[in-house]
Structures are given as structure tokens and as C-alpha cells.
Amino acid sequence: MSRILTLWAVPRSRSTAFEQMMRARGDHVCLHEPFGEAWYLGEDRRCPPQRSGGPTPGLTFASVWDDLQSRAAGSEPVFIKEFPHYVEHLCDDAFLDHFIHSFLIRDPARTLPSMYDKWPDFALAETGFLEQRALFDRLADRQDKAPPVIDAEDLVA
């Protein structure tokens, strides 16, 4: 299995624009927040209670991970854009070793109003800033160097 090229981001950080650029390259299998549906709608979902609807039968974090590993075993490299708060409960060293890590950051003063415009009733647990920072710090400590970080403002400068 090849390691999965991963952009760790938070909602409304211009991460989907980055993902679209990766898709346009045409040389990666690109997946949009593969664990997000399980976080919100999976049988073992972890989203805030006010977000929970009926679970999707058969959708679990394990089923998403199995699919992702199958894709990574294929002939094309895999890129995912993902939010750390969707997977923080999975992030042991063995899990993290499957990825090549990079981070996209955006000033919360820009991200939070954008979230509010899109989802006025969003919960703090959906912002992901604390989880993104915790994952970054953990990886920097593990690797003895910081993973690459892109400031979203640099993408539009």
C-alpha cells in the first residue's frame, strides 16, 4: 500500500479549492473528506448530537478506512483532503504512518464567519481548530520536524 497524500484542513479554509487543483492534475485518485460522512451519518458517528439523523446502514469508520486502504493499494497515488476532528479517535501511530501529511491553515477570523454564513447553527466541535493544531504538534514531535503548512491566503495572493 502506498502512503496517502493528505491535506489536513478545517472547514471553510479554501481546502476544496486545493482539492480541485489536485483533481485537475489528473495523476491522483482524489477523495473529498472520506471520513466526513461516517462522522455525521455513520453507525458509529461522532458528530454533535444536534446533527445526528438516522445512521447509514453499513457506514462506519472501519468501512471508510478499508475502502481508503484498498484505493491506496491500487496503481494510482491517492490524495485526500480531510479534517482532523473527523479522525482524531483513530490517530494512533499505526494509522498516522499511512499518510504523507501536509496542513492548510486559515485565520479563524475569516473561517468562522464563512462557516456561519454557510451553516448558522454549526457547533464548536465542527470547527476543528484544536484538533488540527493537536495533530500538527503530534506529527512535528514524532517526525522531529514540522510537516509542510500552507496558509490559505497565499493560495489567493
Located regions from the model:
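PAPS-dependent sulfotransferase catalytic core
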Residues: 1-73
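PAPS-dependent sulfotransferase catalytic domain
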Residues: 80-157
